[in-house]
């Protein structure tokens, strides 16, 4: 599923209101965690132990807000979105940022925690 196929994207906020990102060890860039449903976001929190204080939704049809979000996270060395990261299996969809919009989406496989 591409981020553009979702009507809304759900993001995890920490206690300071910052969005959660994932960065692999020794990687230069990080990925912004996003989910296609609130249930998937809650599942990730349960499986990973993430201390998300809040789950917020952003309609993908709100192009101005999507563009503003992408510009904001790029300033924090975040270069792509990780959609529906399955913490146990390490699978997700990586959606590249192209300018201030969503670009190419491709399947991504991380090393799951159990295999480390």
Regions found by a protein language model. Give the residues of each.
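Conserved NAD+-utilizing ADP-ribose enzyme module
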Residues: 1-116
């Amino acid at each position: 599923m591409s981020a553009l196929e979702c009507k809304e994207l759900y993001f995890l906020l920490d206690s300071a209101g910052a969005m959660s990102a994932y960065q692999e060890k020794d990687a230069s860039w990080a990925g912004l965690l996003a989910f296609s449903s609130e249930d998937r976001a809650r599942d990730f929190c349960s499986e990973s132990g993430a201390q998300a204080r809040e789950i917020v939704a952003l309609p993908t049809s709100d192009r101005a807000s999507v563009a503003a979000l992408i510009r904001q996270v790029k300033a924090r060395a975040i270069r792509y979105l990780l959609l529906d990261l399955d913490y146990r299996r390490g699978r997700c969809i990586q959606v590249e940022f192209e300018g201030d919009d969503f670009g190419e989406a491709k399947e991504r496989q991380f090393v799951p925690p159990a295999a480390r």
